[in-house]
């Protein structure tokens, strides 16, 4: 019954609807709607098609060469090789005129819009040759520039931020050096402390938790310190080590500064090799980037001493780039067939490189002047297996260590080469003399290490068997062959570390942790022979007054820390630091005083001795007074704590007696104590009476 009633009611409603009037939804005449389409249908209008749809991934390349049809394929090959480095190109159009000659521009479509943006960023203003520099834009830029408003609006004035003094560390009146100590507190979390090496105890300047993920590195002049992070690297400076600049390069593993601190090079891995980016330090702008096939050796770029040029070695060539444009010098590489290595002079725009033996042509060491590309000296070498180039820091000498062989053995396919009867030569180039004469020193024993005296005319070598080697010192003088001045026999050292000021040298065995301090002007006497078990690093301070040896947790996990010595080997500080990883002295910029002024100061140095000694005495007296005050304060604190505990113990006596059966046990054994007086000799003095 209920169902039937419902059906009847439904039918009645249907019949009534046939006679109802339709509602009117039209606006009355003169009605004005105050609601805009954007307010009413904003979500739908955002999805409406636009004129730029489908062309976000298209770039326009202008200023390409205008070539005939015969040369078009070669042009396409060159341009496609450049632009395919930034993504997959799905379509390319080169408009041509009636004669089939290109019009000087092209359209390229990438698979993704982000790839097109990257290509514009990297290749705009790219110099193809002397007459053609690309102008690369997104296709959508035309619409952007068409819609520029006619009324100019002034830019918002940004508040000027006063930057801290980046060179405050060299303004210290007592010229104390600074150093940083890094310790790992967790995985990918390194704490870095900055200290000033004042006497009698170093002073802590700043400590930063989680300052870097791996390690830190100072810039060559000590202005900046660089830290490593997942997104890239950052540089810090100033009195409180504020962030100066950051450089986005994910996965950066290594960085290097240009000598004058104008540029920074970052090395980061890619799926197929490495990406290297050169940055402008002051602006943070990317100047140029390179993609290296395979895992290239770190530090593949070499800078000139004045930051005017940077070079890298290619296959049978050297690529030299000018700054700040970073275009190739004269727009072309220097072709050098068989080149194996090169190095810049530390003081002049001179490149030294060596070429291997080829088809009965001897190996060759060449000095080339840049930017003239003029060869100023050549030296032919025979039976050469390898060469190493060692410049003296002052640029006065170049030593080429030549590994030579008596016999060469090859297999049938020349795939495996063995050198027999090895011996070694040192070719010494006198850079400051006319026509650059070359002297030769032959060593028949295995060479384990080589080191120039930074300021002076001596070099040292470790030669012989690794477990029982000899250390020889040679002196280089004008017009005569380098002479052996001293040989220290049966020394188990592996590395040589000269003082930055010369004269003193540390002979180190970084396997056993033993060190010997030698004065090269006093008959090469060993002044001290300390040891630091498992030490893996040696660091001289910039002034040559202190030496630090360190045991890093990168090598071992126990007994990590560092020791500090004087230049004569006297220990002055031992520091045990858990998870210690790194110790670095802060470099100093070169002095602004002329050589004449420096000579004058050295000549009259005795005049300053009295003032220096008085200042040292006052400092030590002040330090002693501070130490006594500190000890007195500690004693007072302890006595206050002790008296408080004694009073508390006395107040609990009644409770103590009750708990012990009403027996006073505090003085139970006092009567059984025996007192014994013991005398022993402390000091004996003998006085002669006349």
From Swiss-Prot:
Keyword hit for Nucleotide-binding: no
Keyword presence, Zinc: no
Domain RRM: 57-141
Subcellular location: Cytoplasm
Protein name: Eukaryotic translation initiation factor 3 subunit B
GO CC entries: eukaryotic 43S preinitiation complex; eukaryotic 48S preinitiation complex; eukaryotic translation initiation factor 3 complex
GO process terms (BP): follicle cell of egg chamber development; formation of cytoplasmic translation initiation complex; regulation of translational initiation
MF-aspect GO terms: RNA binding; translation initiation factor activity; translation initiation factor binding
Region (Disordered) location: 1-36
PANTHER family registered for this protein in UniProt: EUKARYOTIC TRANSLATION INITIATION FACTOR 3 EIF3 -RELATED, EUKARYOTIC TRANSLATION INITIATION FACTOR 3 SUBUNIT B
Residue spans of the WD repeats: 207-246, 293-331, 334-369, 442-484, 530-575
Role this protein plays: RNA-binding component of the eukaryotic translation initiation factor 3 (eIF-3) complex, which is involved in protein synthesis of a specialized repertoire of mRNAs and, together with other initiation factors, stimulates binding of mRNA and methionyl-tRNAi to the 40S ribosome. The eIF-3 complex specifically targets and initiates translation of a subset of mRNAs involved in cell proliferation.
Coiled coil stretches, renumbered: 595-645
Quaternary organization: Component of the eukaryotic translation initiation factor 3 (eIF-3) complex. The eIF-3 complex interacts with pix. Interacts with mxt.
Biased composition (Basic and acidic residues): 1-11
PROSITE patterns found in the cross-reference section: RRM
Top-rank lineage group of the source organism: Eukaryota
Keywords: Coiled coil, Cytoplasm, Initiation factor, Protein biosynthesis, Repeat, RNA-binding, WD repeat
Annotated InterPro entries: EIF3B (IPR011400), eIF3B_RRM (IPR034363), Nucleotide-bd_a/b_plait_sf (IPR012677), RBD_domain_sf (IPR035979), RRM_dom (IPR000504), TIF_beta_prop-like (IPR013979), WD40/YVTN_repeat-like_dom_sf (IPR015943)
UniProt biased composition (Acidic residues): 15-25
A Pfam entry, by short name: eIF2A
Gene3D superfamilies (UniProt xref): 3.30.70.330, YVTN repeat-like/Quinoprotein amine dehydrogenase (2.130.10.10)
Family: Belongs to the eIF-3 subunit B family.
């Amino acid at each position: 019954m209920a169902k039937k009633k419902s059906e009847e009611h439904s039918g009645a409603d249907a019949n009534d609807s046939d006679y109802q009037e339709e509602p009117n939804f039209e606006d009355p005449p003169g009605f004005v709607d105050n609601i805009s389409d954007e307010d009413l249908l904003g979500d739908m209008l955002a999805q409406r098609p636009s004129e730029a749809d489908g062309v976000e991934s298209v770039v326009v390349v202008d200023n390409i060469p205008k070539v005939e049809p015969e040369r078009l394929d070669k042009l396409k090959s060159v341009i496609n090789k450049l632009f395919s480095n930034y993504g997959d190109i799905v379509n390319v159009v080169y408009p041509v005129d009636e004669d089939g000659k290109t019009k000087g521009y092209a359209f390229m479509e990438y698979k993704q819009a982000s790839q097109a943006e990257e290509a514009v960023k990297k290749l705009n203003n790219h110099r193809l040759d002397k007459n053609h520099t690309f102008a690369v834009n997104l296709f959508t830029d035309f619409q952007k520039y068409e819609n520029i408003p006619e009324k100019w609006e002034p830019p918002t004035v940004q508040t000027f931020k006063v930057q801290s003094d980046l060179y405050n560390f060299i303004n210290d009146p007592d010229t104390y050096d600074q150093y940083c100590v890094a310790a790992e507190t967790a995985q990918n979390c390194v704490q870095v402390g900055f200290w000033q090496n004042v006497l009698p105890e170093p002073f802590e300047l700043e400590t930063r938790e989680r300052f870097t993920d791996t390690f830190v590195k100072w810039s060559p002049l000590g202005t900046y310190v660089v830290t490593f992070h997942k997104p890239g690297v950052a540089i810090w400076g100033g009195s409180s080590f504020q962030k100066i600049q950051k450089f986005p390069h994910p996965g950066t593993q290594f960085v290097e500064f240009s000598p004058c601190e104008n540029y920074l090079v970052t090395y980061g891995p890619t799926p197929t090799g490495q990406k290297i980016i050169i940055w402008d330090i002051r602006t943070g702008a990317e100047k140029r980037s390179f993609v290296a096939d395979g895992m290239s050796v770190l530090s593949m770029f070499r800078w000139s001493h004045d930051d005017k040029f940077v070079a890298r070695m290619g296959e049978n060539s050297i690529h030299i780039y000018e700054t700040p444009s970073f275009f190739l010098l004269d727009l072309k590489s220097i072709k050098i067939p068989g080149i194996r290595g090169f190095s810049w002079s530390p003081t002049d725009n001179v490149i030294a490189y060596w070429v291997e033996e080829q088809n009965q042509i001897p190996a060759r060491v060449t000095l080339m002047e840049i930017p003239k590309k003029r060869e100023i000296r050549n030296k032919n070498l025979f039976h050469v297996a390898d060469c190493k180039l060692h410049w003296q820091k002052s640029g006065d000498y170049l030593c080429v260590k030549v590994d030579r062989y008596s016999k060469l053995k090859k297999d049938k396919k020349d795939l495996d080469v063995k050198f027999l009867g090895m011996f070694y030569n040192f070719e010494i180039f006198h850079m400051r003399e006319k026509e650059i004469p070359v002297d030769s020193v032959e060593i028949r024993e295995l060479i384990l290490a080589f080191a120039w005296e930074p300021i002076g005319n001596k070099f040292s070598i470790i030669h012989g068997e690794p477990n029982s080697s000899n250390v020889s010192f040679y002196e280089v003088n004008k017009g005569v062959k380098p002479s052996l001045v001293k040989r220290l026999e049966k020394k188990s050292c592996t590395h040589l570390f000269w003082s930055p000021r010369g004269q003193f040298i540390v002979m180190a065995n970084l396997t056993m942790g033993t060190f010997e301090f030698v004065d090269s002007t006093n008959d090469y006497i060993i002044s001290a022979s300390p040891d630091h078990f498992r030490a893996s690093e040696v660091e001289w301070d910039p002034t040559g007054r202190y030496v630090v040896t360190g045991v890093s947790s990168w090598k071992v996990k126990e007994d990590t820390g560092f020791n500090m010595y004087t230049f004569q080997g006297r220990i002055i500080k031992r520091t045990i630091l858990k998870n210690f990883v790194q110790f670095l002295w802060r470099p100093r910029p070169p002095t602004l005083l002329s050589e004449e002024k420096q000579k004058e100061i050295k000549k009259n140095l005795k005049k300053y001795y009295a003032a220096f000694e008085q200042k040292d005495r006052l400092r030590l007296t002040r330090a002693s007074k501070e130490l006594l005050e500190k000890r007195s304060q500690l004693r007072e604190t302890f006595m206050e704590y002790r008296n408080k505990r004694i009073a508390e113990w006395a107040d609990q006596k009644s409770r103590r007696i009750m708990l012990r059966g009403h027996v006073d046990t505090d003085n139970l054994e006092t009567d059984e104590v025996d007192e014994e007086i013991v005398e022993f000799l402390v000091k004996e003095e003998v006085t002669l009476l006349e």
